[in-house]
Amino acid sequence: MSPFRISAFQSQTYQAAVILVVGLLMASTSQAENQKPEEPASFYDPVERNIEGWTIAVDPMLLNEANKEAGEKAMKALANHLQRITYIVPEKQLARLREMRIWLELNNPVLGNMQYHPGKDWLVKNGHDPRLVKHVHIPKAKHLTDRHMWAKHPYVVLHELAHAYHDQILDFNHPEVLAAYNASKEAGIYDEVLLYTGKKVRHYGLNNQMEYFAESTEAYFGVNDFYPFVRAELKEHDPRMYKQLEKIWGPIK
């Protein structure tokens, strides 16, 4: 059998094809080298402060001369929130609660309400600093000194820290909390309750087990904006959840 050979025509065609491919590769490489990568979003580096045992990531704008007074007022108000938590939460649970980090901003242009960020995906998708993950986030420092906020939600920082504790220490699907939440929904005990304004409304805690836990924690340790407002009312209105909070947070004497 004669050996396999490439004809002169085939050889010329092959060489031309190789030259064309090499040329395309060189052009593609050159284009890739010249193409500027997308610049990542620019985020400030917060300054760490310790307030009442909590690590606070502080927006540097709150520390400059122009906003010094606003920054001092905000941190003083935040200290007030954290002091009230310190004086009521048992030491063992308090030590874990202090592991929950807080991020304080002067004036976030997009976000308003205080919130907790359990995951990074939402932050990245919406153009926010991914370092906010697992932080209690106070987007607007002025809310800490807002009279309406104190009238409505005097334990708002505890509420957000309860979310962090639920996520990082317990688990959002903690079986006993979830069971108490589902039982309260089935019983309809939160379908129409008194709001701090005197109106009758659907309880905010019915949104999900996370809000149910945070709202109940406010009533257990302090004052909530929805009935049951305080610990004795929670014990009477939702005894099953009250018992779970005693197990989770420790009894209050």
Regions found by a protein language model. Name each.
Residues 57, 101-103, 137, 164, ...:
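Structural recognition of the beta-strand scaffold that forms the well-ordered cores
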Residues 30-34:
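Boundary at the C-terminal end of the N-terminal hydrophobic targeting segment
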Residues 1-13:
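N-terminal secretory signal peptides that target proteins for export/translocation
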Residues 16-27:
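Bacterial N-terminal signal peptides
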Residues 36-51:
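Disordered inhibitory propeptide/activation segment of secreted metzincin zinc metalloprotease zymogens
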Residues 72-186, 242:
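Acidic/His-rich structured neighborhood in mature extracellular/periplasmic domains
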Residues 125-136, 143, 147, 181-253:
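Metalloprotease/metallohydrolase-associated module, dominated by Zn2+-dependent proteases
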Residues 49-72:
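Acidic/histidine-rich, surface-exposed loop or edge segments in extracytoplasmic proteins
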